[in-house]
From Swiss-Prot:
Listed GO biological process terms: translation
HAMAP family in UniProt: Ribosomal_uL5_B (MF_01333_B)
SUPFAM superfamilies with a match to the protein in the record: RL5-like
Subunit comment: Part of the 50S ribosomal subunit; part of the 5S rRNA/L5/L18/L25 subcomplex. Contacts the 5S rRNA and the P site tRNA. Forms a bridge to the 30S subunit in the 70S ribosome.
Organism annotation: Anaplasma marginale (strain Florida)
Job description of the protein: This is one of the proteins that bind and probably mediate the attachment of the 5S RNA into the large ribosomal subunit, where it forms part of the central protuberance. In the 70S ribosome it contacts protein S13 of the 30S subunit (bridge B1b), connecting the 2 subunits; this bridge is implicated in subunit movement. Contacts the P site tRNA; the 5S rRNA and some of its associated proteins might help stabilize positioning of ribosome-bound tRNAs.
UniProt-listed PANTHER family: 60S RIBOSOMAL PROTEIN L11-RELATED
InterPro entries per UniProt: Ribosomal_uL5, Ribosomal_uL5_bac-type, Ribosomal_uL5_C, Ribosomal_uL5_dom_sf, Ribosomal_uL5_N
Family matches, as Pfam families: Ribosomal_L5, Ribosomal_L5_C
Similarity comment: family membership: Belongs to the universal ribosomal protein uL5 family.
GO cellular component, one term: ribosome
Disulfide bridge map: none
Keywords of this entry: Ribonucleoprotein, Ribosomal protein, RNA-binding, rRNA-binding, tRNA-binding
Protein name listed in UniProt: Large ribosomal subunit protein uL5
Length: 179
């Protein structure tokens, strides 16, 4: 299942060296980390909802998520400072490549109305962020044990200097792009 990591070090690096005009393998952009964030909002006050979301994110990422808390009180949203509002995971190394492999080959093709990623989802510094609408598109999540279908955010951080370089890297890895 760890095919994407070895592919990245061998074939992708050689291909990107010729495409981007890099003189050394060390200049080739790489994926540094993948951050997954599941915001629950006001529902996080219920411990059952929080446990369910944390369990689902742990199944998807194969790593225990950390609970995110509100930084300040917002009366309009009825939250106070320190209230749990979601959970997040940062993946690096082998687990990161395993997750990306499952995301590219299994989850994104199963996503409803998914046409591909667009250039507007890049941040200008070579990183891309997008949302997964249904967490049940991952095979690890048992459909019978979930209480509600939730989505989560995925941020892929790379060492690329520009969005063009990052798109070239992610295209070589197999990410589907619209244009």
């Amino acid at each position: 299942m760890y095919m994407l990591g070895s592919l990245c070090k061998e074939a992708v690096a050689q291909s990107l060296m010729s495409k981007l005009g890099c003189s050394s393998v060390m200049q080739v952009p790489k994926v540094v980390k993948v951050c997954l964030n599941m915001g629950i909002g006001i529902g996080a006050m219920d411990s059952k909802v929080m446990d369910s979301c944390s369990r689902d994110l742990a199944l998807i990422s194969a790593q225990k998520p950390v609970v995110t808390r509100a930084r300040r009180s917002i009366a309009g949203f009825k939250i106070r400072k320190g209230f749990p509002i979601g959970c997040m995971v940062t993946l690096r190394g082998k687990k990161m490549y395993e997750f990306l492999d499952r995301l590219i080959n299994i989850a994104l093709p199963r996503e409803r109305d998914f046409k591909g990623l667009s250039m507007s989802q890049f941040d200008g510094h070579g990183n891309i962020s997008f949302g997964v609408k249904e967490h049940i598109s991952f095979l690890e999540v048992d459909y019978d044990k979930i209480d509600k279908v939730r989505g989560f955010d995925v941020s892929v951080v790379t060492t690329a200097k520009s969005d063009y370089d990052a798109k070239a890297l992610l295209t070589e890895l197999g990410f589907p792009f619209v244009n």
